[in-house]
Swiss-Prot record:
Gene: purM
UniProt similarity note: Belongs to the AIR synthase family.
Name of this chain's protein: Phosphoribosylformylglycinamidine cyclo-ligase
GO MF, one example: phosphoribosylformylglycinamidine cyclo-ligase activity
Primary localisation category: cytoplasm
Catalytic EC class: ligase
Cellular component terms (Gene Ontology): cytosol
Lineage: Bacteria, Pseudomonadati, Pseudomonadota, Alphaproteobacteria, Hyphomicrobiales
Amino acid sequence: MSQSGKNGLTYSDAGVDIDAGNLMVEKIKPHVRSTRRPGADGEIGGFGGLFDLKAAGFSDPVLVAANDGVGTKLKIAIDADKHDTVGIDLVAMCVNDLVVQGAEPLFFLDYFATGKLDPDQGAAIVAGIAAGCREAGCALIGGETAEMPGMYSGGDYDLAGFAVGAAERGQLLPAGDIAEGDVILGLASSGVHSNGYSLVRKIVSLSGLAWDAPAPFGEGTLADLLMTPTRIYVKPLLKAIRETGAIKALAHITGGGFPENIPRVLPKHLAAEIDLGAIKPPAVFSWLAKTGGVAANEMLRTFNCGVGMIAVVPASEAEKVAAVLAGEGETVFTLGRMVARAEGAPGTIYKGNLAI
């Protein structure tokens, strides 16, 4: 029998506070309940989350799964003690990857790991996750909170998200009929989103600015503006897909920018010709480029530069698709067109100059 009593060790002595974990669960329950949707109406706390595909209205679905994190944007959240929006980023990075395949996000699970659990901090993070789930229309059906002393220093923590969606068989994207002359629509980003933050933090360090300093590129503090949540494009895109039937492909512009993300959804014989002059980058990108001396090509392969999502549509349907998206609050513009690609040529071609 193990030693017990006042001289015996407890789990708390090792740095794990079960009571703090239980307190956090109670704090997050209302946030989790707020994400309920057809197919998911259970409570958290079981060994697994449940989802009923039939109740969600699917007849012959194909499931689509994605997982992602927030990257070193979390270091800004930690250093600035601002934790209420990183959960939105976490959801956005996953569900935007689902919708580009034509899938409706159904449910989400999170993983939150920290060296020492702060129930209030954890609840703020999960509140953000729930907000992202509501915006995407998916249910938060479970998650894991891991308190791991010795694994993380100070107040550091990490997040991972897992999302599952579905599309009816035969309705997945990209479609097989992308053709030369198709139009590329750009959907504006809300800012840096959740990629390139190691470079962002390096540039901020070179600038000498503190996180609570007024941002040189907008209203608010540097931390507030750099922590602007990643835009969630799910509901507008699903509406455009279903109402127009004209979207042939979508690409989520994340790490690697245009050259790493657009070719992933294109056939080998086509390239995306991008008109850089059509982009109106948010002021943060000009500040990053000038303060860090970052060349335009490096900006384009690191950041979204103002375009968080692209859609490939027939030229004859571009105006209709853009109108549906604009009606749902998106800023949409003609970004380029599909052109022939020679064997071995890059999948993205630029014309014009980026206004940074």
